Each structure stands twice: as structure tokens, then as C-alpha cells.
Amino acid sequence: MSGRDNRGAGGGGGGHQPLSNAMGKLKEKLTRVGDELGYHRVESNLSTSNTATSLDTILPEDPFLFPQVSPQRHPQNTVRTQRLLEDEPPLSFRPLLEDDDINEPPTQQQQRTPLRASGSLELTPLPPPPTSLEIREHRDRQQRGAQGDELQRSKQSLKGSRVSFERRDTGNSNTNSNKAAESSDEDSFEEKRTGFQQQKATSVDHKGILKDLKHILANDNRRQFQAKKHVSLDVKGTRFLQDLLKESSSEEEFHKTRREFQGRKHQSLDPRVTFKLDKVLQGSSTDSDEEGEDAEHKRLIHRPKDITKPVIIDLKDLESESDEDFLTSRQHFQQQRSISTDSRKSRRLYEMDEMDNKRGENIRHAVPFVRQITEDGKPKLEVYRPTTNPIYIWTQVLAALSVSLGSLVVGFVSAYTSPALVSMTDRNITSFEVTQDAGSWVGGIMPLAGLAGGIAGGPLIEYLGRRNTILATAVPFIVSSLLIACAVNVAMVLCGRFLAGFCVGIASLSLPVYLGETVQPEVRGTLGLLPTAFGNIGILLCFVAGSFMNWSMLAFLGAALPVPFLILMFLIPETPRWFVGRGLEERARKALKWLRGKEADVEPELKGLMRSQADADRQASRNTMLELLKLNNLKPLSISLGLMFFQQFSGINAVIFYTVQIFKDAGSTIDGNLCTIIVGIVNFLATFIGIVLIDRAGRKILLYVSDIAMVLTLFVLGGFFYCKTYGPDVSHLGWLPLTCFVIYILGFSLGFGPIPWLMMGEILPAKIRGSAASVATAFNWFCTFVVTKTFQDLTVAMGAHGAFWLFGAICFVGLFFVIIYVPETQGKTLEDIERKMMGRVRRMSSVANIKPLSFNM
């Protein structure tokens, strides 16, 4: 034993220094590895009385850490190790948990139960070192926790008014942190911190809800106000520019002033300048005395409580909810707010789409947003610019007057049989016999020919052009009247009437198309009235001249009327749209210059025509007749056909064609020719009354009034003729037929005269409007032929009273048709009407806005 001890002691004297160096290196390396792996250093309180231990209770068994000092290799160094450990306590490491505070020692629960070694020394056993996968997972958790904290802080940060709250919140957080550091009860501290965070989130989101909902509501009211101001500002601007054009000494000065005006208007229309959001939120009353400000704008500024009241109610509802429901509502609100607050980038594009539906027909007079497609395919706002040039009216008046003279010829030809048939059946005047059947064909063949002309007119205006097609009817009108004037038999009269009716069918289709493609929208309503007015003038002229002339002289007058029409048609150009359709861009530009004025900028309008033509070419390959048979197209087409049916079967053309004969059969005490003149004057004046009321009272109201007036007068006329034939003497009531005819014509001209033609252009879908209008026009001429051809036969078979009662019964049925099926289109854009009829919207062409040629025939 002593020898072993001496050898050990002697060996220890030489080996103590290497072992001490090794333990120092071991301590440094373990400390460094523990810091890198996120381990926590724990100092063990060792008793100096512990005299024996083994190195394997201190060192990990991994030889990677220190292979040179393994207890298995050097068991003789155990005693020396015990002596060294009396001066230097060992190290113990464990994983750092998420709940640990690096500034505080571990709790009793976190410390492991010490294991007793072979001696009396108590040491904490070391866990095995973590693997590389565990190290990566631990670092990932730390990064995710840091990112989550950063994201939570960014979500809770608000703008503007919340800065002060965050400062107070920072102070409260520091106070709570100090209190938590001083608190020894960790669970109590966590409860306080959680409660504070919930209170902060609630108060912050209440403020956010109130502010952002105010912002959203203010934007809605602001968009409505801007939509109104677009119209008012541009109207004022247009008048200003018109006055400036008259007063300007030079063109350069005018354009310079116009550019300055557009710049000021661009600023005034900018939402950030015209309608500050803080005025609504703060309830500013500084603008209360400004003149000319919109009433809605004032109400929003002076009564902000109207906006915030529903928001406060919603906040009270939120406060009454449970914590879970409130958190759900808050999350939903945050999702909405992330969309609504990005207003600077998206607000204008959204407003453009919304205002397209609101502005409707007013888009011509407003200052619209102009979109430009960028390289990435997204639309962006480029500039504001006006849509129209200053109106150069005189050339457009000349164009409208030229085609309206053709309408005068149409009206004269249509009313020819009413005064002419009386003298034509008189054997003392006519050299040939005209039987009752032949007389019915003289009146009825013109509508039949008009049906054929309407069908042929569609291809002709596309092949020859609008102007050339109208011009081509002038010579046949002259020939037809000369053929009737020089007739020696009924066949010549019928040939002349057929040729005249064929030209009437072509003209009635081409005249509205020409006006719609040449006249600017600002004057289209006024100039669009000229064909209707001139058509009724032609009817009145025929009635007045027929009271002094026989049928032959009246026909010679009809041959002279187309001459000024023929001359003026040579002075006006073809429509620009037709030139664009033929690829003649330069000729289209010249036509626009003639119509709009030499100084006008016609390039924007020309580009619009080219885009419309491109859209039409893309749809040209479709079979339009098959499109008519689709269910969503049949409804508007059926309504249009129904209105045409009730218009003609009200008996209007029978009354116009046979007015003199009706008054002669009635035995009226008033001269028949004078009665026709009075009816013509009423027809002419009633047209203007209908134009004034049609956009004020509405379409359906006027149809109701028109139908009721016709039903009453037709039944009264039927009763008069019945009493004259079978009943008591009514000779003392000779004024009654004229009174009934005046009321009948007045009622027809208010409603069933112009409205079926107007609604045909409104309710028919854009893609089938051309073909559907041709079908409706042809059907109208067919009904006209049936009524005029069978009227005299009806009076023979049923008596005059039976014919008028039949027409009255049909009008009575038409009243229910209007009530049930006809929609109200007053004040609605063509897009809105089509959306209601078909459930979708497309861009409408300018031709769709015209009022078709309409006069009583």
C-alpha cells in the first residue's frame, strides 16, 4: 500500500501540472460550447468535505470534447482530480427553456434531482449534447418568435392620432415590466400583463373602427358629391369657353386661356383638394357662408353626427360582445381595413368604375376620367380632358334640314289618299272609274310597298351609303307623283303609289340613321325633332292643298316638293361612320371637319368611330337572325312588336287616309276639307307637346293617357255612327265627330305615336338593334297595310260604328299590355335598360341614342 501510495504521490508530483492545464482547457471549452448551444450555466455549491468523485460524473462521455483526459484512460488521477475540484467547483449545463429569465437562477422545479457519486460530493448530471437538428430547430423557433413579435407590433401600430396613445402605452409597459421584475409570483404577473394587452387592443381597435368607418362613409358621400360637381363644372366651363371664343382676339389667346382653365378645373376636381376628409371628421363649419356650394356638401360638413351615429351604435354592440366574439369581429375588421385604407393607390380606379354607372347619359357633359393601358396591362389615370369641341351648329342644321325635306315629302305622300280619293271617285272629275275595291288598294298599296322598301333599305344604306341612299329616293318620288298625275287608268295610279311607298320605306329607315351619325349629342334632341315636324308639315300641306285641288293637281304639287330636297342633298357630305366602315379614314376626317368646323379637333371623335367599327367587325360573323330567337332577346323584341301592333291597330292611318270620307259619311255640319285641315294642325302641334312631356311625365304615363283618350273617343265615334244609322236623329251633334277626332289625334300624338319608335331604340339590345329594328319596322308597315286595306271593307261589313268599336276594343287590350309588359325607361341610360332587360351591360353606340323618325301616317 505504501509503495503504491508513494508511486502515486511521486507520479502525482510530475502529472499534477498537465492535469491542471487540462482541467482549465476543459472548463473553457465547456463554457464556450454551452454558450454556443444556448445552455445555461449553473454553479454547484460543493461542500469541502466531499473527498472523492469520479471524472465521468463531471465530463460528458463524448470523447470529442476532451479525449486526452478520459477517466477510463487515467484512473490513477482520481485523487488528484478530487483535490483540484475542492478549489474549483464543477460546471453543469441544461437546455435554456422559453420561460427562463437569463438574469434569474433556476427554480427548484427546473433543477434536476442531484445524483450521489461514489464520494460525498453532490453534482447535477449533465444531459447529452444536442444534435445539429435540435440546434437548427431551436434557432428557427427563436427567429419565428422574433418575427411574430414584430408582426404583432406592426399590426397594433396606428397612424396620426394613435401616436400619443402608443407613448402612454410605452410608459405603461415599462411600469408593468418593472413591477413584474419585482414580483416573485410569476403567474400573477402573467395575468396582469395579459389583461393589460387585452385592454390596449380593445381601446386601440375601438378608435381604429371609429376613424376608419368614418373614412369609408365619407368616401361614399364624397363620390356622390364629385359625380354632381363633374356635371356642374363642365357646363360652366363650356359656357365660359363659348363666351371666350366670341371675345378672343386671336386663336392663340383662346387656346392659352382654355389650357389655363383646364388646369384649374383639374385641380378643383381632384378629390384631395375639393373634399378634405378632415372637414367631415372634425365637423368644420368654416365653409358655412360660401356661396354656390352643393347642399349635400354643406350637410356633410355641418352635421358629421349623421355619419358617426351608426358607427357609435356598432361600437356599443361590440362592447357588449364576449371576448371571443370581439376578437373575431376585430379580426374581420382588420381584414376590411387593410383593403379600405389603401385608398391612394386604388380609390380613383374604383371610382371610375362606379361613376360609369352613375353618370350614364351625363357623361357627354361631364369631365370623364381618361384611362390608359400601361405595359403591364393595368389601367391608370392619365389626364382629365373635355369630351366635346365647341359646337359649330350651322353645318349640322343644314344637314338636318336637307334630310328633313325628305321627311316632308314622305308625310305628303302618306296623306295623299285622304283628300285625293274623294275627287278620284267622282266621275265628273276622273275619266276612269275607281271602284270601292280599287280605292282601298290605292290607299293600301303604299304601306305594302313601304314594307318592301324597309327591307331593301338596310342593305342599301350599307352598300351605297346613307346620303346616297336618301338622294336616290328623290327622283323616284318625282316620277311616282308624275305617274299618278298623268294616270289614265287605275293601274297607273297603283304603280305610282307602289313606287312612292317603296321610297317611303327606304327614307323612313335611312333618315334617322343619317342624323344619328352626323349630329353632335348636344343638339341631337333639337335637330332630331326636325324630321318629325317636317313630316307633320307635309301631312298638313296635303290636307290644305287637297281642299282646293283635285287628285291630279295635288299629284303635280307632290312632284314639285322633292326638287329642293334633291338640291340640298348634294350640298351635304356622307356620314363619317360610313367612311370609316369602308376604310376611308381621310374622307371621314374631311366629313367631320365639314360638320364640326374647320378649327375643331376631330381626331378624338374619329378614333372613337374607328374603335366602334372594330367592335362591329368582331361581331359581324354572328348570325343575327339566330340571335333574335334567343330567349333574352325575344322579350324586348316582343315588347317592341306589341307596341307597333297597338299603334297601327288603333286605326290612326285609317283615320288619316280617309279623314274626308269619314266626315262626309258622318254628315257633319262642318266642311270635310276644313275638318282635315284642323286635324292636320292638331297633329302638328301635338307633336311638340309630346316632345316636351315625354322626358318629364315618363313613357308609361303618356301611354296610359294616350290609350284612354283613344278608347273613349273611338267608342264615342262608334256610338255616333250607330245612332246615325239605327238610332235617334243626331244631326244636331254635327260638331261631335270633329271634337272626337281632335281628342283622338291629340291623344295619339302624346303617346302611341312617338313612343313605340322611341322605345324601339331604347329596349332593343345593342348587338341585335339593327336587325331587330328592321323586323319591327317591317311589321309596322305590314300592320299599316292591313288596317288601310281592310278599313273600307270593315265599314261595309260591320258598319262604321263596328270598325270604330273594333279599334277601341284593341286599344283597351293595349292598355293592359302597357301595364303588364312595357318597362319605364324615363331617366335611364341605355346600359341600365339593357341590364334590366337582359342582365348585362355593354357599351352603346351613338346611333342608339337617336329618336327614330316618327310622324303620323
From Swiss-Prot:
Membrane topology of the entry: Multi-pass membrane protein
Predominant subcellular localization, coarse grouping: membrane
Biased composition (Polar residues): 69-81, 171-181, 330-341
Induction remark: In perineurial glia by starvation-induced hypoglycemia, possibly in response to TGF-beta signaling; dependent on the BMP-branch-specific type I receptor tkv/Thickveins and its ligand gbb/glass-bottom boat, which is induced in glial cells upon starvation. Not induced by insulin or adipokinetic hormone signaling, nor by the jeb/Jelly Belly-Alk/Anaplastic lymphoma kinase signaling pathway.
Compositionally biased residues, Basic and acidic residues: 134-143
Segments in the Cytoplasmic topological domain: 1-392, 462-473, 519-528, 574-636, 695-700, 762-767, 823-857
Glycosylation sites: 428, 550
Reactions performed catalytically: alpha,alpha-trehalose(in) = alpha,alpha-trehalose(out); D-glucose(out) = D-glucose(in)
Topology, Extracellular side: 414-440, 495-497, 550-552, 658-673, 722-740, 789-801
Tissue-specific expression: Expressed in perineurial glia of the outer layer of the nervous system that forms the blood brain barrier (at protein level). Expressed in the fat body (at protein level).
Subcellular location: Cell membrane; Vesicle
Modified residues (Phosphoserine): 248-250, 320, 322, 845-846
Disruption phenotype: Pupal lethal. RNAi-mediated knockdown is lethal. Pan-glial specific RNAi-mediated knockdown results in severe locomotor defects. Pan-neuronal specific RNAi-mediated knockdown is viable with no defects.
Function: Low-capacity facilitative transporter for trehalose. Can also transport glucose. Does not transport maltose, sucrose, lactose or fructose. Mediates the bidirectional transfer of trehalose. Responsible for the transport of trehalose synthesized in the fat body and the incorporation of trehalose into other tissues that require a carbon source, thereby regulating trehalose levels in the hemolymph. Required in glial cells of the blood brain barrier to fuel glycolysis but not required in neurons.
NCBIfam families hit by this protein: SP
Record-given protein name: Trehalose transporter 1
Organism this protein belongs to: Drosophila melanogaster
Recorded name of the encoding gene: Tret1
